[in-house]
Amino acid sequence: MKYTDNTQFIEYIKSLVGKQILFKLTDDADDEGLIGTLRQFNGNLIIERDGLEFVIELYELYHIEEYK
């Protein structure tokens, strides 16, 4: 999905809070991504996966979408 500005992207990310997400940390075509839950804590976005919490800056993500 393409966004015309950062505001749209930020609103999309906010809509994913509390949901399971599929995210990628590389642009490798063979990377199938990881599944986690996007949470918000003290104003920070955290991805929880297998009981671990990852604090990841949005610019570090190559892809993020709701996992279905």
Language model segments and positions:
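Short glycine-rich, low-complexity segments
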Residues: M1-E32, F41-N42, I46, D50-K68
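Conserved glycine-centered beta-strand/turn positions repeated across beta-sheet architectures
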Residues: G36-L38
